[in-house]
């Protein structure tokens, strides 16, 4: 829509073919078992569970990794909840760990997940007062794979990524956002289209200024050589 709220037909059409998010490795942290506040509250302590992680420590608790499933779904029985690989929309990152207290008297084993729009998160309760939780995984980069058609007859496929806009027929198409409630399973991509009709004149002006500087430099050099 324009400034008057009227619908304006764009000179190009965009169809989203695929949206991809690449996330940072999952993290584990301690939280208050009653309030859910991170521990420490001001500067939460975390450990990164990447491909090299085996053991770590959170506020004195020793954490041992038993299993990590990047895309999983819960399998619930009467007494337990297990996680199995599940490569479908809404899958969660599930980590099975064993946590041992600083004095070695308490040992807990269980699953921790960050949850998704489809499944709730799961924490591992340690001593009734604190639990181990997994915060939402942070996006490292995300991009849209699009099909583009213009009134001028252009038909192309392209990738648009944050800080890597697509330029086409005087337009710049930026990757702006996505449906954060769906996370990496988002089926919506937010793009921003920007057109500056004065941009070619700006570039032309800059080019003329650069040429003028070159000619001025050459002219000064010739005058200097003539005097010598």
Regions found by a protein language model. Give the residues of each.
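Solvent-exposed, non-transmembrane regions of integral membrane proteins
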Residues: 1-228
